[in-house]
Amino acid sequence: MSQVTMRDMLKAGCHFGHQTRYWNPKMGRYIFGARNKIHIINLEKTLPMFNEALSFVEKLAAGKNKILFVGTKRSAGRLVREEAARCSMPYVDHRWLGGMLTNYKTIRASIKRLRELETQSQDGTFAKLTKKEALMRTRDLEKLERSLGGIKDMGGLPDAMFVIDVDHERIAISEANKLGIPVIGVVDTNSSPEGVDYIIPGNDDAIRAVQLYLGSVADAVLRGRQNAGTGDEFIEEVAASEAAEG
């Protein structure tokens, strides 16, 4: 398992927290000190916690489990979409719709509608409609794609959730908590770590830091899948050679 290093985190600026006046006392144990009224996160505490979270992700991926990537603030959305797509995991990058997990039955119906509209847009149905009706359906399709496009292939509730800014995604976390879905989350000095099972204390705003978290989690997913594949192939090879010998 390849691990994130202290140097990786320092280069990405993961140690810069928020202004001291905005701190959350629950994050006190992860704060090293302050510089120019900015809290500095103790990366000696973050590093093992981050690597523990990555190890958990790798194990989940090896077991063919689904991890939902969540990051809906503007600075994180594009990276969430790209990294989740790179490792073929579901994601929410635009807006968390209340009930996305706790009312999944309704969400599933909306996904079905999204698929119907996708088919209609490709099979010539839109071309047969009036201009107004075609425009309305196109708008519906775009709206559904923006909200649900990242989870349309999820096929059921995820086995874990990875969150970039825990304050921004508090509704998503509370839904996961209600359903017993483990939460991995980047928690900055102004946020509460409550409801997060795998806490990664770190800067949740700097683009380079966000890229490091997402890229590392996506890499852990790909590694886990690869290891699972290697294991299966090895077992099959052993079974085949034993059969040949028998």
From Swiss-Prot:
Keyword Plastid: no
The UniProt record lists the keyword Ribosomal protein: yes
Gene Ontology BP, a term: translation
A Pfam family this chain is assigned to: Ribosomal_S2
Molecular function GO terms recorded: structural constituent of ribosome
UniProt keyword annotations, A-Z: Ribonucleoprotein, Ribosomal protein
GO cellular component: cytosolic small ribosomal subunit
NCBIfam families the UniProt entry points to: rpsB_bact (TIGR01011)
Family that this chain belongs to: Belongs to the universal ribosomal protein uS2 family.
Protein's UniProt name: Small ribosomal subunit protein uS2
Protein species of origin: Azotobacter vinelandii (strain DJ / ATCC BAA-1303)
